[in-house]
Design a protein with these regions (language model features):
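C-terminal helical subdomain
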Residues: 209-249, 256-258, 264
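Conserved glycine-rich cofactor-binding loop
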Residues: 7-9
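A glycine-rich helix->loop->beta "capping" turn
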Residues: 45-50, 69-82, 88-93
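Rossmann-fold cofactor-recognition segment
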Residues: 44-61
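Conserved glycine-rich Rossmann-like NAD(P)H-binding loop of the short-chain dehydrogenase/reductase
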Residues: 21-37
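Catalytic loop of short-chain dehydrogenase/reductase
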Residues: 85-93, 98-102, 121-182, 190-205, ...
Length: 273
């Protein structure tokens, strides 16, 4: 099971839970020191040292290198958890020419998924499909995503984050249409408001800090990810979940026509296909 954004937050919490349950986990993270700490925590939980790979999703060549290394190391991948994400204040385009938030939160994971697609398909069995689980957010509701130009610079980091979360859900919708027949089930989920460094930078924190009961731990946020990665009842192609239950998303984030347009433009943006 490959988990991106695994060096902290819900990615790390999910990796620990999966390892504790006996699963072989592969960690992908950006910061070498935090990634090393995550390896130690996952090893303590599962009794085995997990493989780890470093990649900064704001640099697509690093994603390509990590994807190639993982594909070379594993003949099959049962689960890909696309959890890497960032609410970045960087307003300049990445070296690849894209909005930084959109590249980190959408295009990087989209590229990695395609690089590992053969390994996911190799793991698929008639009654036990491979799975792609993507972390979404309520922020999709305020996104201003241009599905024909996903890397277009957004006017604020909040709108960029919302657009990237729209893209996550739309990609799940189209992945389900394309890949369910290959034995790959794509789902996504909203983890809730998380008590972490990432969560404290969200616009909801200014309100939620006065009602601390609204915030959840990283472990609680990761629960639905782990469920979607492992439970037979979670095999709902294109499903959007929260708290282990179906969770509605806006029409803009679930429109099949928009999903297909985004898929085509994203392939061009990451130079795939």
């Amino acid at each position: 099971m490959v988990v991106t954004g695994a060096s902290s937050g819900i990615g790390l919490a999910a990796a620990v839970a999966l390892a504790r349950a006996g699963d072989d986990v592969v960690l992908l993270g950006r910061d070498p020191r935090r990634l090393a700490d995550a390896v130690s925590r996952v090893r303590d939980a599962g009794g085995r040292t997990p493989a780890s790979y470093r990649a900064d999703f704001s640099v697509l060549d690093e994603v390509r290198a990590a994807g190639a290394a993982i594909a070379a190391a594993y003949e099959r991948i049962d689960v890909l958890a696309n959890n890497a994400g960032q609410l970045t204040s960087v307003r300049r385009p990445t070296a690849d020419g894209h909005d930084a938030t959109m590249q980190i939160n959408h295009l990087g994971g989209f590229l990695l998924t395609h690089l590992l697609l053969d390994r996911l398909q190799a793991a698929a069995k008639p009654q036990v499909p491979a799975r792609i689980v993507t972390t979404s957010s309520l922020a999709e509701a305020w996104g201003t995503l241009d599905v024909d130009r996903p890397g277009r610079r957004q006017i604020s980091r909040w709108l960029a984050y919302g657009a990237s979360k729209q893209a996550n859900i739309l990609t799940t919708v189209e992945a389900a249409r394309r890949w369910t027949g290959l034995g790959i089930v794509a789902t996504c989920f909203f983890p809730g408001l998380i008590r972490s460094g990432f969560g404290r930078r969200s616009p909801a924190f200014s309100v939620a800090r006065f009602a601390p009961g609204l915030f959840r731990s990283s472990e609680q946020g990761a629960d639905t990810l782990v469920w979607l990665a492992t439970d037979p009842d979670a095999l709902v192609p294109g499903g959007h979940f929260a708290w282990r239950a179906p969770f509605p998303a806006t029409g803009r984030s679930t429109d099949p026509a928009r999903a297909q347009r985004l898929w085509r433009s994203s392939l061009a943006a990451v130079e795939q296909g």
